[in-house]
């Protein structure tokens, strides 16, 4: 069961954002391998791989939540890339962050928009949408 969850989680993480999955592994594998495994199994293997939402809707919800936190830039970076990889547009993601200004505050929305600007520039440099 655990190996199945891990494999499913890694597949989901790599399908959403291959570079982000590698960054997560590099950041945690040596310093906190148990946390890394829990993130892969639970977040990606159990939750993000569920059939109830299509990947685009799931990523919009995730970007909304991470924007609202206001302090989850590494996770938001991953999910901005993932959202774009599954078909969200830059305009849609920008609108999501603007909506969060009402509910999470302008500073949280600004933090997300500043990060989105970086992510968009990185993707432009790579020729990605």
Q: Which residues does each predicted region cover?
A:
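Short coil/turn motifs at helix boundaries and re-entrant loops, enriched in small/polar
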Residues: 54, 70-71, 93, 105
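Short acidic alpha-helix initiation/capping motifs at coil-to-helix transition points
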Residues: 37-40, 70-76
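Short, structured motif recognition centered on aromatic/hydrophobic residues
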Residues: 58-66, 96-97
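Acidic, glycine/proline-rich low-complexity segments that act as flexible tails and inter-domain linkers
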Residues: 1-56, 110-129
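Substrate/cofactor-recognition hotspot
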Residues: 59, 106-107
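A general alpha-helix detector
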Residues: 12, 43, 78-79, 95-96
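A short structural micro-motif
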Residues: 67-68, 86, 99-106
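Extended intrinsically disordered, low-complexity coil regions enriched in Ser, Thr, Gly, Ala
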Residues: 72-94, 109-119
